[in-house]
A protein has these predicted regions:
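A structural-propensity feature for long, helix-poor, extended segments
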Residues: 132-134, 143-146, 150, 440-443, ...
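Internal maturation/activation junctions in enzymes
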Residues: 79, 130-131, 142-184, 368-387, ...
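C-terminal amphipathic alpha-helical interaction region
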Residues: 100, 458, 474-596
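A short core secondary-structure module
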Residues: 188, 192-246
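Alpha-helix capping/hinge segments and adjacent helical runs
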Residues: 2-5, 10, 90, 183, ...
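Amphipathic, small/basic residue-rich leader segments at the start of a protein or domain
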Residues: 1-125, 149, 372, 580, ...
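Glycine-rich cofactor-pocket loops
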Residues: 29-32, 62-75, 287-298, 312-354, ...
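A glycine-rich, basic-preceded beta-loop-alpha segment at the flavin cofactor/substrate interface
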Residues: 197-199, 236-252, 257, 264-295, ...
């Protein structure tokens, strides 16, 4: 059976030493998250993930969710009790504003908790994750009465939330949606249409489900400019907050999926359901993007989380599985064979996964900290810089962390040989569960196009130039340190590749957009590698300083070796991405469609 141990030590290293979040005590909520409080929260979060959620992961995969004749849906055995424990423990509202019943702690902390839960049970974690994304949209764009009516119950886990975008004929292109909204005399709307692929659309974990639904008001402009956002509760809410009549929204069926079987992915039918406008008419994408950006960062964490749990299991197997002898002579002469972890190619594979996991985790903490600054700082300049960072890094994180997270799940499965293909080992579930993260909340090809088409040129390239300057400044400050050269020199080379690629796109994509389209995925992966290199250089600097001050520890020594492995064996791929980008789109676009 699979195992999982939350990486508390690594998270503490990032929070306390690399990013020193105590320096942000001036931000609301940070002074409440002292080192002792963080340690206690992470410890309890680890216990919850390891002892409650992880044992249910296999159960959820085998049982799945069941739809009944009346349209109701039941979740796998144990999910309801676990969700109650999560809700009553305040885990859903860890970073939600105190005015709505949350604890108001930093997002930086709640994202670490999110990783633990996603590793332990990705399908289960989605029920709460989507709920908090919906609350974020309501808090930013909802009317005061909507916030009062819905958000506290959602933060408490008494009600959950969803987002309803996709329809059979429209996925990425939401301008094609057909769900309609008809305004009523009392100011409400009647919503009619069908939505598909709705995660947590119907279940038995909470007494009400609050759906955020994109629809088109009668007479609205065509395309994306005519889309509005509505809040549509499963059960109507009376003026005093009590539950009233059942609304006209039902689960038509549950999708039969490759993975995340423990999450109820539904076809939702809206048959004149009562809903209320969120924000302004025809500006629904503004509200939905709040939720989608939250979701994209959450999905990025899913990529990391599945890579982490797959890695832990692959390492455990590699230590125990006896097969063959070391190329340099027997390492376990008293046994019939050596454990496979002695073999260089096995170590290469495991280090490849580990080096990604630790850099990706640093990137998540770094970006979560920027999110806290963007939403909590009183300094307009700091908020703008943090918001720039969020806009730039969101597509990179969503695309790269989920692409590599899936690849790493496959690599970890490979460590098991034929046993990894057998369901009882649990590795094939990690592969199946990780796959969806590359698709939903904006397929990764769309993330790449968003990066090169919108985020790169935005505000005259202000965000990307700020990133370049930050990395270059770090390299200049530490390049002369002999101990840092194995980290700084490769990082600087990779940064040069990214800068060359950026210049090429600026010179060749404006007049020929297909050049940008053909280069987009390589550019996104290149950007991710450079960001990982920067994270590794920062972690290496802190590790070296701690060793100089207090001596080496196994954790710090391992950190430095893993970082060097990344620089030597993974970062050189930036030159390949650059070469592909600079070839342009000629061969990509040359063939007629019929030739494929």
């Amino acid at each position: 059976m699979p195992i999982y141990k939350a990486p508390v030590e690594d998270v503490n290293f990032l929070l306390n030493d690399v990013f020193q979040i105590d320096r942000y005590d001036n931000l609301p909520g940070f002074s409440d998250a002292s080192a002792d409080v963080r340690e206690a929260i992470l410890g309890e979060a680890a216990k919850l993930a390891e002892e409650v959620l992880q044992p249910l992961n296999r159960v959820g995969d085998l049982e799945g969710c069941a739809r009944h004749d009346d349209g109701s849906v039941t979740t796998p055995k144990g999910f309801k009790e676990a969700f109650k424990q999560v809700a009553e423990g305040g885990w859903l509202g860890l970073s939600a504003p105190a005015e709505y019943g949350g604890q108001g702690l930093p997002v930086t902390l709640s994202q670490a908790v999110n990783e633990f839960q996603c590793s332990a049970n990705m399908a289960f974690s989605m029920y709460g994750g989507l709920t908090m994304g919906a609350t974020a949209a309501l808090i930013v764009h909802g009317k005061p009465e909507q916030k009062k009516m819905f958000v506290p119950k959602m933060v408490a886990g008494e009600w959950t939330g969803t987002m309803n975008l996709t329809e059979p004929q429209c996925g990425t292109d939401l301008g094609l949606l057909r769900t309609k909204a008809v305004k009523q005399a009392d100011g409400s709307y009647k919503i009619s249409g069908t939505k598909i692929f709705i995660s947590a659309g119907e279940h038995d974990l909470a007494e009400n489900i609050i759906h955020l639904v994109l629809a088109r008001i009668e007479g609205a402009p065509a395309g994306i400019k005519g889309v509005s956002l509505f809040v549509v509760p499963k059960i109507l809410v009376n003026g005093d907050g009590s539950l009233g009549a059942r609304n006209g929204v039902t689960c038509g069926s549950i999708e039969h999926k490759m993975g995340i079987h423990g999450n109820s992915t539904c076809v939702m039918n809206y048959d004149g359901a009562t809903g209320w406008l969120i924000g302004e008419e025809n500006k629904g994408m503004q509200g939905m993007f709040v939720m989608m950006n939250e979701a994209r960062l959450g999905v990025a964490v899913q990529g990391l989380a599945q890579s982490e749990v797959a890695y832990q299991n692959a390492v455990a197997y590699a230590r125990d599985r006896l097969q063959g002898r070391s190329l340099s002579g027997p390492k376990a002469p008293d046994k019939p064979a050596d454990p496979i972890i002695v073999h260089p190619d096995v170590r290469r594979t495991l280090l490849t996964i580990r080096a990604f996991n630790e850099a990706a985790r640093a990137m998540v903490v770094w970006t979560a900290l920027k999110s806290d600054v963007a939403h909590r700082s009183s300094d307009p300049k700091d908020r703008q810089e943090a918001d720039d960072h969020m806009g730039l890094m969101t597509p990179v994180m969503k695309g790269v962390l989920t692409d590599v997270g899936f690849s790493n799940a496959v690599l970890a499965q490979q460590m098991y040989g034929g046993h990894g293909y057998i369901a009882e080992q649990g590795m094939e579930q990690f592969v199946r569960d990780a796959r969806i993260a590359m698709i939903y909340e904006g397929a990764n090809g769309i993330q790449a196009l968003d990066l090169v088409g919108r985020k790169l040129p935005r505000d005259g390239g202000r965000a990307v130039m700020a990133f370049f300057n930050e990395v270059a400044t770090f390299a200049k400050e530490h390049g002369g340190d002999e101990a840092m050269k194995p980290y700084v020199a490769p990082m600087s080379t990779a940064l040069g590749h990214l800068q060359q690629a950026t210049t090429w796109l600026m010179q060749n994509a404006m007049m020929k957009p297909d050049n940008a389209g053909a280069a987009a995925t390589d550019y996104m992966q290149l950007f991710g590698l450079v960001t990982f290199a920067y994270m590794w250089a920062r972690m290496a600097k802190v590790a070296l300083d701690k060793i100089a001050a207090s001596g080496a520890t196994p954790y710090l020594t391992t950190k430095l070796v893993t970082g060097r492995f990344f620089m030597e064996r993974m970062l050189p791929e930036t030159s390949v991405h650059l070469a592909r980008i600079q070839t342009g789109c000629a061969t990509t676009m040359e063939l007629a469609a019929e030739a494929f």
